């Protein structure tokens, strides 16, 4: 199992797990430490248990072993934020056009979804950049054909939710929150989920869908109960204050 230990340590640290947590009841902490340093071997069945303990699929692990590099889709996501937050519509248009060319060349559906995501960001900056109903339907189909949502899908939803109908926001929000395997033990993913649900909550309040709003408020209270993140808790207080304002102004 050459290099397996080193790769396992990479994923363990990436996902924020201690040696003790990763070892669990599958192996001793010292055995796992030696395995990561390449000093001993472990059985295949034990190895699969360890991967499960740190929430890493065999497919992702194998990809990493094959000199896994950051994918073009990761590069795409990384380039979006600085252009969006600087209101650089020209930069976003360039990214969208590049993704469209890749779609036309390869036929890969995700490139088409990427162009819609960028169009959604452009729409947030300038409402003259319209996202068509057909494009939104493509996104809906894509999401509910995916058996497992990862950070890409949550980011996609977070960038387009303002265009969704309220019933659909509630639906995808429930789907996200019920897929606890995605965010329960991984801090980065949990932050994405909290951010998305804060936006869903605010959007439901804005549109006077109080039953849906109450659902997201209840879930967020549980998610943030033991959280030390100041920004998320401050945002929660802001939306909570907005709810009080709406109630008192009626």
Positions of predicted regions on the chain:
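DNA major-groove recognition helix of helix-turn-helix/homeodomain DNA-binding modules
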Residues: 45-60
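Amphipathic alpha-helical segments of tetratricopeptide repeats
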Residues: 97-104, 138-145, 177-184, 215-226
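A short, Lys/Arg-rich alpha-helix, primarily the initiator
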Residues: 1-14
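Helix-turn-helix repeat elements of alpha-solenoid scaffolds
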Residues: 85-98, 127-137, 166-178, 207-218, ...
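Short alpha-helical DNA-recognition segment
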Residues: 16-33
